[in-house]
A protein has these predicted regions:
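Alpha-helix N-cap/loop-to-helix initiation residues
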Residues: 10-14, 80, 111-112, 139-143
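A charged, well-structured terminal subsegment
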Residues: 129-160
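Short, glycine-/small-residue-rich phosphate/pyrophosphate-handling segment
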Residues: 103-137
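A glycine-biased structural micro-motif
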Residues: 98-100
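N-terminal beta1-alpha1-beta2 submodule of the flavodoxin-like/Rossmannoid cofactor-binding fold
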Residues: 1-75, 81-93, 148-160
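Conserved short-loop catalytic and cofactor-binding motifs
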Residues: 2, 75-78, 107, 135-138
């Protein structure tokens, strides 16, 4: 089974989880980034406001063709209790995604808020099927038990 992991990471937490999943499945990693350069303060002020409004930003790569994959995994930090504008743009720019099964995870330092329902909405708007979703608090990022739970969630989704 071919798995593609598309993720956005600012502090490295989401990247760490994505890499852990990729190593367990020999999956392809695609890190999406914002093309606009922000300083630390403006990045969170501007992008958190955009996240709250469920807006998208301009990203690199602008689109990802997932037609050759059997499962796609999305990863995002939580900003303003929702996934980031970067991952929103990535989902919106997908090619070959109709009817693909998807798994989503988020990393956060507080609470996930409306992240799950927002991820679900965006994924289903693109014609994909969300088969699993989870959230990981930043204090659990290095926790082997928690990362194994995420890998097990993806493994169970592979069997769907």
């Amino acid at each position: 089974m071919k798995i593609c992991i598309i993720y956005h990471s600012e502090t490295g937490n989401t990247r760490h989880v994505a890499q852990h999943i990729a190593s367990a499945f020999d999956a392809q990693l695609v890190e999406v980034t914002d093309t606009v350069s922000y300083n630390r303060l403006t990045r969170f002020l501007v992008l958190c406001k955009m996240a709250n409004r469920e807006e998208k930003t301009v990203i690199e790569p602008a689109s990802v063709d997932i037609s050759g994959f059997d499962l796609v995994v999305f990863g995002s930090p939580v900003w303003a209790f929702k996934p980031t504008p970067v991952i929103h743009a990535a989902i919106n720019g997908l090619k070959g995604c109709m009817s693909k099964p998807a798994v989503a995870f988020s990393t956060h330092g507080g609470r996930p808020g409306k992240t799950d329902e927002t991820f679900k909405k965006w994924i289903e708007e693109r014609g994909m099927v969300l088969v699993a979703i989870t959230n990981i608090h930043q204090k659990d990022i290095e926790n082997q038990k928690k990362t194994k739970e995420v890998v097990a969630l993806v493994q169970a989704s592979v069997k769907v």
